[in-house]
């Protein structure tokens, strides 16, 4: 189904009729098209092709796809052939669709724990279905609840930080990729903090000496999630923002930090926070997130070390549910980094627009010399040394101790 009506509902699961539809995020912001997911294979392809993305969202879609797959199987007349062993193999296969994001692996491993109560030779039955259904519903509901808690906890951290710095006036926040409703069950993680902060600290609402004036989403090459998705969400919610390319970050921070405007119709509001999501946070706090996140942390560190006094210091915040924390992996060196196809870097895909801005057919346009060598990792790892805080649904925000170490818990 397709329309031009805008929506922030990335995952639609019909709990009565057991149907799963996902918003095809490859077509945003120009088209709102939902794809039906009826099998585990459907989910694998949607996740692999990034029609759905964001660590929490792909975990939820993965779990719901198993529910729908089993439900449809049990409706068949000949439903005595599928064994637990086959389902376990399907789960292992589904995990490989996006190996860096720990949420998907965690969810599917939880389902494998459910299956350990059965013999591999057992036939898939209604009891197994109901247990996986209940788990998946809980996963979805808890993610939404946790995202709202992340937003509130991030807001409190921002308020306390600015008060401690005795900061006054307008400030800005920078982010990368998409970490909002389109990447989760709703509200979002990093973008959820931005939502909560703007609602409480926009100029007309703020009871503090400071207010959130502007958001700067990075374009997020090569897949452009910041340009396509985060801008879509910010515009939808009427949160003031200006899109920038990934290679404009240093110049923007420097300009605003030197009390200069970047546009005549904007105030001077220094970037005080860079808030990012996470696909995996390991035991020491090293964080895998969208490629380009690491460089944001090094830029913030440069300005904090060499350029800015405390009033203009930039806090680098990671926002993620505790399901993203991986205590079994010691450091970021052990994280498997997914590499994407070369054509995602050497081509651009999007609809043609005529002079009136009307949307036409989707086309692929080359932007690089054909056949060249390309390196296209989907993620990088930000060292914990460059992270100021990790905000989860726990009201106690994770900050480093006197030795510069995080002590993370699940």
From Swiss-Prot:
What is the uppermost EC class here? Answer: isomerase
Q: In which pathway does it act?
A: Amino-acid biosynthesis; L-methionine biosynthesis via salvage pathway; L-methionine from S-methyl-5-thio-alpha-D-ribose 1-phosphate: step 1/6
Q: What is its EC number?
A: 5.3.1.23
Report whether Transmembrane helix shows up as a keyword of the record: no
Q: What is its main location?
A: cytoplasm
Check the record and name the Pfam families matching this protein. IF-2B
Gene Ontology biological process terms in this record:
L-methionine salvage from methylthioadenosine
Read off the InterPro entries from this record.
IF-2B-related, IF-M1Pi, IF_2B-like_C, Initiation_fac_2B_a/b/d, M1Pi_N, NagB/RpiA_transferase-like
Any Gene Ontology CC annotation: nucleus
* GO MF assignments: S-methyl-5-thioribose-1-phosphate isomerase activity
Q: Where is the active site?
A: 279 (proton donor)
Q: Where in the cell is it found?
A: Cytoplasm; Nucleus
On the tree of life, the source organism's domain of life is Eukaryota
Record site feature (Transition state stabilizer), residues: 177
* Substrates-to-products reaction catalysed: 5-(methylsulfanyl)-alpha-D-ribose 1-phosphate = 5-(methylsulfanyl)-D-ribulose 1-phosphate
Record key words, sorted: Amino-acid biosynthesis, Cytoplasm, Isomerase, Methionine biosynthesis, Nucleus
Q: Name the SUPFAM superfamilies on file.
A: NagB/RpiA/CoA transferase-like
Q: What does this protein do?
A: Catalyzes the interconversion of methylthioribose-1-phosphate (MTR-1-P) into methylthioribulose-1-phosphate (MTRu-1-P).
PANTHER family in UniProt: METHYLTHIORIBOSE-1-PHOSPHATE ISOMERASE
**What is this protein's record name?**
Methylthioribose-1-phosphate isomerase
């Amino acid at each position: 189904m397709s329309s031009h009506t805008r929506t922030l509902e990335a995952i639609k699961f019909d709990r009565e009729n057991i149907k799963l539809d996902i918003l095809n995020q490859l077509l945003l912001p120009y088209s709102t098209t939902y794809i039906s997911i009826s099998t585990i294979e459907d989910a694998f392809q949607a996740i692999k092709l990034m029609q759905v993305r964001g660590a929490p969202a792909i975990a939820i879609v993965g779990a719901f796809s198993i529910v729908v797959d089993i439900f449809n199987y049990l409706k068949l007349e000949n439903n005595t052939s599928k064994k637990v062993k086959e389902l376990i193999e399907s789960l292992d296969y589904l995990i490989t669709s996006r190996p860096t994001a720990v949420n998907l692996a965690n969810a599917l491993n939880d389902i494998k724990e459910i299956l350990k109560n059965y013999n591999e030779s057992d036939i898939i039955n209604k009891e197994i279905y109901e247990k996986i259904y209940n788990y998946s519903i809980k996963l979805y509901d808890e993610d939404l609840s946790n995202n709202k808690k992340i937003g509130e906890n991030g807001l409190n951290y921002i308020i306390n930080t600015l008060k401690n710095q005795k900061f006054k006036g307008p400030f800005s926040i920078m982010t990368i990729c998409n970490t909002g409703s389109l990447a989760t069950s709703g509200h979002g993680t990093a973008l959820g903090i931005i939502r909560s902060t703007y609602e409480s600290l926009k100029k007309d609402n703020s009871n503090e000496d400071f207010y959130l004036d502007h958001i700067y989403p990075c374009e997020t090459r090569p897949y452009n999630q910041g340009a396509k998705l985060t801008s879509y969400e910010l515009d939808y919610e009427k949160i003031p923002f200006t899109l920038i390319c990934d290679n404009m970050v240093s110049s923007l921070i420097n300009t605003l930090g030197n009390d200069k405007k970047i546009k005549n119709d904007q105030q001077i509001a220094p970037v005080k926070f860079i808030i990012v999501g996470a696909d995996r946070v390991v035991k020491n706090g090293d964080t895998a997130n969208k490629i380009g996140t690491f460089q944001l942390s090094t830029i913030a560190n440069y300005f904090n070390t060499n350029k800015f006094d405390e009033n203009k210091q930039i806090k680098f915040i990671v926002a993620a549910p505790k399901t993203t924390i991986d205590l079994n992996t010691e450091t970021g060196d052990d994280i498997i980094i997914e590499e994407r196809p070369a054509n995602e870097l050497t081509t651009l895909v999007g609809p043609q627009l005529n002079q009136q801005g009307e949307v036409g057919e989707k086309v692929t346009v080359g932007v690089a010399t054909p056949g060249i060598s390309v390196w296209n990792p989907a993620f990088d790892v930000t060292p914990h040394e460059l992270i100021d805080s990790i905000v989860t649904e726990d009201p106690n925000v994770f900050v480093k101790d006197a030795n510069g170490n995080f002590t993370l818990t699940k």
